[in-house]
Design a protein with these regions (language model features):
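Immediate flanking context of iron-sulfur cluster ligation sites
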Residues: 191-200, 242-251
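Iron-sulfur cluster-binding cysteine motifs and their immediate structural context
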Residues: 30, 204-227, 233-234, 244-274
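Auxiliary alpha/beta "docking" domains used to position bulky ligands
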Residues: 13-198, 237
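Short, intrinsically disordered, charge-balanced linker/junction segments flanking boundaries
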Residues: 278-283
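A short, flexible beta-alpha/helix-coil linker loop
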Residues: 190, 231-232
């Protein structure tokens, strides 16, 4: 009985701490936060093995599939993962028009403003400090994009959104326009439920992808994706040069056409946009 009562008390304390973490997260500019276990991502492991076998990988992500799918290889004491999302703007006020004689380039919206790794890192550091104040002996490891875990798989399991046919996590509040990050923690929080939603019969993103890079079930052939092609240093095949058009970095087509993104344009004070820089004149 004493063990049972101890577990009940511990659960109540962790639920109280969870609510405090959520409230604090919102106060520092984190738009969405969710909790999941530190269990392996077995379904993702199978998908990644198929992905690599088909030659779809970009080469930018961690190549060790075990590291990508087994959180405790990164932090052995991990009991939970806290996933966060920060929305970014997708509309540019006062943007110069691209017209004949004054052609303008385009950057993917995720690259607008300050480097998003810095934006996310500051928030994760503040959140980690807050948790350490409450639980001094907690062990934490934070990750943003360049970490070994799949940000999208963590976010989906933590209930931040569902994976759309364009491969992005689609949130009811943020659409696909969000930066994702996570932290492994040695505290056993109650996990949140994944979001039960889907794209239904909609295939607009698949149909409108300029290079046919979306291959179904949320999978992407990175070798054909313009976002990857504008970042690779390898030889660019002629068939893709025309399709890239005036894109200088990245591609947002599969997000721009997504019906789930209608009416969404999240703003934050530390994401400052400069139209002349974001739509530069092409020589």
């Amino acid at each position: 009985n004493s063990i049972c009562n101890f577990k009940k008390v511990a659960k109540l304390m962790n639920n109280k701490l969870k609510k405090e973490i959520i409230d604090f997260a919102h106060s520092i500019g984190i738009d969405s936060i969710g909790f999941t276990t530190a269990d392996p991502f077995d379904e993702l492991k199978q998908k990644l093995e198929e992905y690599h076998a088909k030659g779809y990988a970009s080469g930018f992500e961690e190549s060790n599939i075990s590291l990508r799918t087994e959180p405790k290889l990164s932090l052995p004491s991990a009991r939970s993962i806290i996933a966060i999302a920060v929305g970014y703007p997708n509309k540019l006020k006062g943007a110069p028009k691209s017209v004949k004689g004054d052609r303008r380039g385009m950057f993917a919206r995720a690259s607008w403003g300050q480097d998003y790794h810095s934006i996310m890192r500051k928030r994760l550091d503040k959140l980690a400090d807050f948790i350490k104040e409450k639980v001094p002996d907690v062990e934490i490891q934070s990750m943003v994009d360049t970490g070994v875990l799949s940000d999208r798989a963590v976010a989906e399991r933590a209930g931040l959104g569902f994976t759309g046919r364009n491969g992005f996590v689609i949130s009811p509040e943020l659409g696909t326009w969000s930066y994702l990050g996570e932290m492994l923690v040695s505290i056993p929080f109650e996990p949140d439920d994944p979001l039960l939603d889907s794209c239904g019969d909609c295939t607009i993103c698949v149909d409108r992808c300029p290079t046919g890079a979306l291959v179904g079930n949320g999978q992407l052939n990175s070798q054909k994706c313009i976002s990857f092609l504008t970042q690779t240093k390898g030889y660019l095949q002629d068939e893709y040069r025309y399709k890239i058009g005036n894109r200088l970095y990245g591609c947002d087509t599969c997000q721009q056409v997504c019906p789930k993104n209608r009416g969404i344009n999240t703003q934050h004070d530390d994401i400052v946009l400069e139209p002349e820089i974001l739509k530069p004149r092409l020589v």
